[in-house]
Amino acid sequence: MHKKMIALDLDGTLLNSESKLSDFTIDTIKKISALGHKVIITTGRPYRMAHTYYKQLELDTPMINFNGSLTHLPEKKRGDEQCLTLDKKYLLDMVANRDTIQADFIAGEYRNKFFITDPNEHVADPKLFGIESFQPENQFNPERVTSDPNCILFQTKAEDKYALADEMNRHYDYNLSINTWGGPLNILECNPKNVTKASALTYLLDKLNMDQKDLIAFGDEHNDTDMLALAGHGYAMKNASSVLLPYADSVTDFTNNEDGVARQLIQLFL
């Protein structure tokens, strides 16, 4: 069988609503990998919030984090990894205008650290950042922002997160890629201009000498649109946002709480 690259979003797609992998999904992904297909976790999460799933699935393939800002082979030092950043001025500006965007919190995300405006468990769930509790070193302070972040993450009270993303993209003259993330949570992520899951997957396809038609992708949210459009075959989850549906070739028969990805992969390969 011709080998495929299978790009898998995590939240709302591979993970259930409790942010867990079922045993059925784990077993299925292992079988798919054993056939030689390249399973690529493709997520808005930083690596520290995705590595547990990578290990559970026993993957040895590259991973895409921060919606495309970081493409790397976990635990390995490789010269061909891609780590992209955005100008720190955008982080400082968003913090200065946090009331305008109705932000509960704003965080600057780096490969191995983050700074958050409100390190308070009543405002932000520490687990959203892959930790059990916030520490003093996580507190945002303009003086600490000495380097450019991989992305900016914030939660908003705005009723329509998609409209806010569009408004902010216009405000910053499309010098950023601003997308929604986090399934049902009102979370927006800001990445460097033209950086998306699709741009990272294009980079990987080139590195692995694979064709775009051999890419299969699964997603559920606005930040998966480019990825599904790029793929030879893009699947929107049964539980996907309606925003994603025009970009999908198919919709899975089952939701993320029903092992929708695993069941579709079994139909395709097992």
Where are these regions (language model features)?
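Short, acidic loop-to-helix structural element flanking the phosphoryl-transfer center
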Residues: S19-G36, C83-Y90, G130, F134, ...
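Short, structured coil segments at secondary-structure junctions
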Residues: L57-L59, N67, H171-Y172, L230-A231, ...
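Active-site phosphate-binding/coordination module
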Residues: L21-V123
